[in-house]
């Protein structure tokens, strides 16, 4: 059965892949009035009972997300979903339709782009996209080419710029993955204030675990070569900062 009552306030989480959107969403769904239903444009996402929904028009998909969303056992005043940058390629007009949705608030989650790419390559190699329990198995160390780094860095820059250009600053909140790990309470308080949702003491019951806890220097086999190549340029910062020092969880 699909919900058809007057729509709660809409929001969307936008990000590059492997930036902590599952973790943020799990924390937000702990709130008694917030419901975030996963990846709207992912046909395999189990939050959505309509597996053929991607055959709908862009407008119909957004109506499904914000007006006829799956029911929840709580009083929902804020409803959202999340979309990763590559998913817009398959629906070229969807971004503009999203930007036109009345009252939409956007949470842009960012991460050290090199960390994001390394994590993406690891997940593709192992087939493990989420981790729900701790174990001693480390993901494989990987190597990245200069070309794939440059392409990914540019894609991230272009996507972040597109989001900032498309939405009024009052409707856009930027959250850093590192801050979400190190200062979750402060980050979540900022998100609630931005959404206009009541304050809430989060239980920290999110079961999603970090898959990689090693530094870039240890998890990226050709880290030194890449750092040397990008030294002095706009992407040198990605080789100076990583989130390995952040706590797991």
Swiss-Prot record:
Gene3D superfamilies: P-loop containing nucleotide triphosphate hydrolases (3.40.50.300). It is an enzyme of class 2 (transferase). GO terms for molecular function: sulfotransferase activity. Disulfide bonds: none annotated. Its EC number is 2.8.2.-. SUPFAM superfamilies: P-loop containing nucleoside triphosphate hydrolases. The keyword Mitochondrion does not apply. Keywords: Nodulation, Transferase. The keyword RNA-binding does not apply. Required for the formation of sulfated nod factor. Proposed to transfer activated sulfate (PAPS) to a N-acetylglucosamine of the nod factor. This is Nodulation protein H. It comes from Rhizobium tropici.
């Amino acid at each position: 059965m699909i919900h058809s009552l007057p729509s709660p306030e809409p929001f969307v989480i936008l990000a590059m892949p492997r930036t902590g959107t599952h973790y943020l969403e799990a924390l937000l769904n702990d709130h008694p009035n917030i419901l975030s239903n996963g990846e709207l444009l992912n046909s395999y996402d189990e939050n959505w009972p309509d597996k053929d929904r991607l055959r709908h028009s862009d407008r119909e998909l957004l109506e499904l997300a914000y007006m006829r969303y799956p029911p929840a056992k709580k009083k929902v005043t804020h409803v959202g979903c999340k979309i990763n940058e590559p998913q817009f390629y398959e629906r070229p007009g969807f971004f503009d339709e999203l930007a036109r949705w009345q009252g939409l608030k956007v949470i842009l989650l960012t991460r050290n782009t090199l960390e994001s790419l390394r994590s993406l390559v690891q997940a593709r190699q192992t087939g493990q996209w989420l981790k729900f329990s701790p174990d001693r198995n480390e993901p494989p160390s990987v190597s990245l080419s200069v070309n794939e780094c440059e392409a990914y860095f540019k894609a991230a820059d272009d996507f972040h710029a597109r989001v900032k250009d498309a939405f009024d600053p009052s409707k856009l909140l930027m959250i850093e993955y590192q801050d979400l790990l190190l200062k979750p309470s402060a980050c979540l308080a900022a998100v609630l204030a931005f959404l206009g949702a009541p304050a809430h003491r989060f239980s920290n019951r999110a079961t999603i675990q970090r898959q990689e806890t090693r530094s870039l220097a240890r998890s990226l086999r050709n880290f030194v070569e890449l750092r040397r190549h990008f030294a002095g340029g706009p992407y040198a910062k990605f080789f100076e900062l990583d989130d390995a020092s952040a706590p797991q969880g």
